[in-house]
Amino acid sequence: MKKQFRIKKNYEFDDIMRKKQFYSSPTLVLYVRKKKEEQSRVGITVGKKVGGAVARNKVKRQIRMMIDEVFSFEEEFDTIVLIRPTFTQEKYETNKKFLESAYKKVRIYK
């Protein structure tokens, strides 16, 4: 996932999460906001309950890989992927299926 497609500012995270349009699964929560500008962007949030810094960074790398395979950047959506602590207990393929099903509910799927 290229850096231009990432959400980085705290106020942008807050704005998207305040809209309260979300889809959840056992390992992650997907917050969505329709936007009328340029391209889609994605933000990833991993809490400290997931593990130490190394574990959290590994999870972020995995999510970025999954998003590249699953997410269509042609749609005009800002999304935030919030990772739950159960994410590390599941296999990569299972987590990818949960992410795909969340994006299918939003209808932003490749």
Where are these regions (language model features)?
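Positively charged, solvent-exposed patches that mediate nucleic-acid binding
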Residues: 1-110
